[in-house]
Amino acid sequence: MNKSYFIGLMSGTSMDGVDAVLVKFSGDTPSLIAHHSEEIPAALLRNLQKLCLPGNDEINRLGHLDRAVGKLFAKAVNTLLDKAGVDKLAVIAIGSHGQTVRHMPNLEMGFTLQIGDPNTIAAETGIDVIADFRRKDIALGGQGAPLVPAFHQQVFATPEHKRIILNIGGIANITYLPGNTEAVTGFDTGPGNTLMDAWTQYHQDLPYDKDGAWAKTGTTDDKMLLHLLSHPYFSLAAPKSTGRELFNQAWLEQQLAEFNHLSDADIQSTLLDLTCFSIANDTLALSTMGEMYVCGGGAYNTELMCRLKQLLPHYKITTTAELGINPQWVEGIAFAWLAMRFHLGLPGNLPAVTGANRAAILGGKFSAL
């Protein structure tokens, strides 16, 4: 059977599910053939959230969750292929990002750790797996993130326009495509949905604030917003990346000590503005006008999109759907693309973005045989 497909697997810092995509490439141009989102079971989600918090972790828990996430990713692949009516023998490789449980690239011995055992995925799908995409970049002195700007450049760049590709998952990141000979720039701007989701889960017993409806009922506290924006991360120069190790519920509770007079809704509104202002500040530092295309879960938050448009009046702001890719599936397709790059022996990182000392082929192969 002729092998012609790649599969991309992604679970981001929001931990809102495993996205699986079936992709066919013509050169670097992807065609999305099928997609599937696999829910993370509640017990597994709770254990993953515990593992992501700074502290002393049990090796047993890590090992168990590594296998459990691998099995969940494999289930997502098998369901995807069933839905698409595609035989596993037609798939060249799976590109699996895994689930990040630590991302600490700025230590003296920086590291990043994604779990979701690729051996388990290969064994339970019968398909070769390309995984462990971030650690080569860190070994070369880089941040290991963000990796998606290389994909954004290949798929979304145009010489006619300055474009920002904004991904809002748990953490938000931007890719600046200048449309000329300037180097592509990309970095994490700070919290995306992670703080808003944590606050909503704690006070509303809901997984997230749908459409930003709860935030819309509150009033942003300017003093609290300025306090949050004074965090040193926001003034760091690129390359930079961050994660739940820094911006999490425990950190938020520490910041709220002098703001306990605010209502829960006012705090939610302020957290939404923290995301929007940090994105807008970094965007304006790159260019005062242009086009912005949003992907990730934040693209569906109507209040967030509305506030971004108010902060960036000289930007045309819409979602990546206008460029032909549904915002939910952009990152999954990016990891199918990275698997394709590995298969062809081509580099997958942009040193100007990550800070690595050279471009490199990312990932390792885990054979199904």
From Swiss-Prot:
Keyword annotations: ATP-binding, Carbohydrate metabolism, Kinase, Nucleotide-binding, Transferase
Protein purpose: Catalyzes the specific phosphorylation of 1,6-anhydro-N-acetylmuramic acid (anhMurNAc) with the simultaneous cleavage of the 1,6-anhydro ring, generating MurNAc-6-P. Is required for the utilization of anhMurNAc either imported from the medium or derived from its own cell wall murein, and thus plays a role in cell wall recycling.
One GO process term, biological-process aspect: amino sugar metabolic process
Organism: Shewanella piezotolerans (strain WP3 / JCM 13877)
Binding positions (ATP): 12-19
Pfam family, one: AnmK
The protein, known as: Anhydro-N-acetylmuramic acid kinase
Pathway linked to the protein: Amino-sugar metabolism; 1,6-anhydro-N-acetylmuramate degradation; Cell wall biogenesis; peptidoglycan recycling
GO terms for MF: ATP binding; kinase activity; phosphotransferase activity, alcohol group as acceptor
Gene this protein is translated from: anmK
UniProt-listed InterPro entries: Anhydro_N_Ac-Mur_kinase, ATPase_NBD
